[in-house]
Regions:
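Nucleotide-sugar donor-binding catalytic core of glycosyltransferases
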Residues: 1-177
């Protein structure tokens, strides 16, 4: 959290944010992600060209300039319109309309959950998965958008999951990656 007033409540804070550490406000710590051996098998047994994993939810409180949720939705719609057989979407709540990052968006989703609509807003949606690696091992590329952009050093498991599976990530997020 970049809210300095919250940091002052504690004796010490650990953060991934280099700027906070540079100003003596925290200690930079990068949490390790177990990478394992990795897989290099070529692509002959990978039938799916592109996949995207993510939940259909938007971040409230983040300026739209930083929030990549709407860009994720644009990318999904582009593939559905231009290369539908080459793209698969996995995650939660994509059977609902695109989530707005407002209270109104939460209200719309609550109605959609209660009233079964007869439309499929994201035809590429294949459902949720328990094991992301199984899907990545059958895919050549994965769309890897962080939830927000522009925060140096902020990365999540998304990009590591792709690398470990020998999958090529199409990345958008931290500018220093």
């Amino acid at each position: 959290n970049s809210n300095i007033s919250i940091h002052k409540k504690y004796d010490h804070v650990f953060s991934w944010d280099k700027n906070l550490a540079d100003h003596g406000l925290s200690t930079k710590i990068l949490l390790a992600h177990p990478l394992g051996k990795g897989i290099i098998d070529g692509y002959k047994n990978r039938d799916q060209l592109v996949v995207l994993f993510g939940s259909n939810r938007a971040l409230r409180g983040w300026h739209p300039k930083f929030n990549l949720y709407s860009e994720r939705v644009k990318t999904i719609k582009w593939f559905e319109n231009n290369a539908p057989s080459d793209f698969a979407l996995y995650g939660k709540k994509w059977n609902l309309s695109a989530r707005l990052s407002t209270r109104f968006g939460a209200f719309i989703h609550s109605i959609e959950k209660r009233i079964p609509f007869k439309f499929n807003p994201f035809p590429s949606w294949k459902g949720s998965v328990l094991n992301k690696q199984e899907i990545l091992l059958c895919s050549r590329f994965s769309v890897v958008y962080e939830n927000i952009q522009g925060l140096e050093g902020y990365i999540t498991e998304k990009i590591f999951d792709a690398f470990v599976a020998g999958n090529v990530p199409i990345y958008w997020g931290a500018p220093d990656i």
